[in-house]
Amino acid sequence: MQQFFLPAEPAASKEPTEQLRRASIRQVAEYNARFAGGTRPFRPPRGCRIDTVCLTPPPPTGAGAPEERFFAFFREAREVFDGAELILSPPETAPVRTDFSRRGVRGLLRESALFEAFFRAAYRTSALARTSILLPFVSDPTEADAIRRCAERALRTLLYHREPFDETIPIGIRVETPAAVLCGRQLLEDWDFAVADADSLAAFALALPQGERPTPCGAEILRELTEKCLETAHVCGRFCGIAGFLAADTSALPRLIAHGAGGLFLPPEALPAVSGALAKIR
């Protein structure tokens, strides 16, 4: 397993100190491509330095090889955020909450040619910048072998064409359902890091429509789910970040930090407020 986002000087004890947790938390700008053709998707917020970017390209449509379109998307981000670490996610093939058979990696495994194209583009990007891969909607430990086979086929193709790449890049999972939280230890045995997505957990645990915020009782349930995910990751020695509305909730930051959140995956417009809140906590 590859180490991911770990501090340069680990604490001597097994339990991380509060100071270490605060020092190691990372802010990640999320760019999930939902933009019209010709519009630049990458607009860094003013006054914030971005060290890590999470990128989800649009599903490929029309003419052009999917691999080249993914690679062009990632390469542009690398040029805009020169020196930043890139966390690359494949696009959803069918982001419909009611159709679990086509969500995340399940849908991508059914469209293996597209999934392999993503892996090839991601590994090619690793020759240009420090890179990680983040897989969406992984909730079943038995999916790991099929995902690995898909990645291995992509690597063999790159080797055949003598493309440069880093084969050791970390691969993580996005935890989006209560089931994934409950079987977190089995899932994390196969992956290098995790990101708990509060928006998806709200949708599946509380049946909330997209964009609707939970009641205080529902919010407490979500905090317990994300904290369980963080604690499981800590026991397994894995990095765990938080995405969704909880990551941008400045009032929740002290509690997330206390439970060992290693990173906050945020829309770019939320970065200034969260940066200010973190500075006050420190």
Segments from the language model and where they lie:
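Conserved alpha/beta-domain cores
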Residues: Q2-R282
